[in-house]
Curated annotation (Swiss-Prot):
InterPro entries the UniProt entry points to: Salp15
Functional summary from the UniProt entry: Salivary tick protein that downregulates host immune system by binding to both dendritic cells, and CD4(+) T cells. Specifically binds to the CD4 coreceptor on T cells. This interaction prevents the activation of the Src kinase, Lck, and its downstream substrate Zap-70, and results in deficient activation of PLCgamma1, the repression of calcium fluxes triggered by T-cell antigen receptor (TCR) ligation, and a subsequent reduction in interleukin-2 production. (Microbial infection) Protects Borrelia garinii (strain VSBP) from host complement-mediated killing by binding to the surface of spirochetes and preventing deposition of host C5b-9 membrane attack complexes. Protects Borrelia garinii (strain A87S) from host complement-mediated killing.
Induction: By feeding. By the presence of Borrelia burgdorferi.
Record-given protein name: Salivary protein 15 Iric-1
Length: 134
C-alpha cells in the first residue's frame, strides 16, 4: 500500500514539473516580439542536433534579418524571412529574405554553435557545419 501511495506522489510531482516547464517555455515565447509576429506554431526546424534550441535561434536570426532591413533603409514592407535550409553552419552565414527578389547573406551571431563539440562562429575556421545522419 505504501508503494502505491509513493507512486501516486511521484506521478503527481512529475505532472507538476511537466506543467511548470511547459508554462515556462510558453511565457518565454510570449515575451519575444519576434515570437509574437510568428504566424505558425509547431514549426519543425531542420538544424543540426547540436543546436539545443532551434526555435530560439530561428527567432534570433529573424530579428537580425529585420534589423538589417531597417539599417539599410530598404522599403518598409513587413516582410522578412529566413529559411532553415539556407543556414550555413560551416561558414556561419544565413540567407535573409526581405522581398521576392531581395535576398542578403548575413553572419550568424558569434556565439552560435557550429559544431558538435562546442565550436562557435567566433572561430569560423573550427566550424564543421551539418553532420549528415545526425
Amino acid at each position: 500500500m505504501e508503494s502505491f501511495v509513493a507512486m501516486k506522489v511521484v506521478c503527481i510531482t512529475v505532472l507538476f514539473v511537466i506543467v511548470a516547464v511547459n508554462e515556462s517555455a510558453t511565457s518565454e515565447a510570449r515575451t519575444s516580439s519576434a515570437a509574437k509576429e510568428t504566424k505558425k506554431k509547431n514549426v519543425t526546424l531542420h538544424f543540426p542536433s547540436y543546436i539545443r534550441n532551434p526555435q530560439k535561434l530561428a527567432l534570433e536570426l529573424l530579428e537580425i534579418c529585420k534589423n538589417n532591413k531597417s539599417r539599410n533603409s530598404l522599403p518598409s514592407t513587413n516582410y522578412s524571412a529566413i529559411n532553415d535550409k539556407y543556414v550555413d553552419f560551416k561558414n556561419c552565414t544565413f540567407l535573409c529574405k526581405h522581398a521576392e527578389d531581395r535576398n542578403v547573406t548575413l553572419d550568424l551571431p558569434p556565439n552560435t554553435l557550429c559544431g558538435p563539440n562546442g565550436e562557435t562562429c567566433a572561430e569560423k575556421s573550427k566550424c564543421v557545419g551539418h553532420i549528415p545522419g545526425c
